[in-house]
Amino acid sequence: MAKLKGLKKIDKIINNFTKENFGIRANLDKEFLAYCGSKRIGYTLAVETEDINFFLEDAQARFPEVHADPFLWFLMHEVGHCMTDDTWTEAEKERINCKKSELSEVEDDQLRNDLYHTCPDEYFATRWAGQWMIKHQKKIAKFWNKIQPAIMEFYKKNRLLEV
């Protein structure tokens, strides 16, 4: 498999930001994920449009004053999971996970996603992310001004974006 050009730069920028501000490590993954027990998040550079739309619909309705790229929202939401993980007892986490597993039976995409975003851990992770981005606008802007050009450079170097 060919090496992806520019990935180390992206990883370094993200990890500098997440370690410095939250004590959390980050690495490339198949999707945005939180591994709260190990204070680690996964990020991706390829997100399905439908996922973006459902998530942003919820996040922007709750935080219309936050004008952030979907990448920032997803990343900060996963950080939010790690930062709010100690809110829940093990029994509560089990109930939340049980509720989420039942959502796969809901056929209507919009309803399933609406219910997903009302799960306490999802709700609190998004709330944490929105509040943090409001309170730390300069930090998030500085991070975005570093990561966005690195991502665009990555796309160009790997011929994922023809300009």
Predicted feature residues:
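Short Lys/Arg-rich cationic patches that frequently serve as NLS/NoLS or arginine-rich RNA/DNA-binding motifs
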Residues: 1-5
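Zn2+-dependent metallopeptidase catalytic core
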Residues: 6-21
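Active-site scaffold of zinc-dependent metalloenzymes
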Residues: 25-69, 79-86
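Long, well-structured alpha-helical subdomains associated
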Residues: 67-69, 108-163
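A conserved beta-strand element that flanks and buttresses the S-adenosyl-L-methionine
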Residues: 75
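Post-HEXXH active-site segment of zinc metalloproteases
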Residues: 85-122
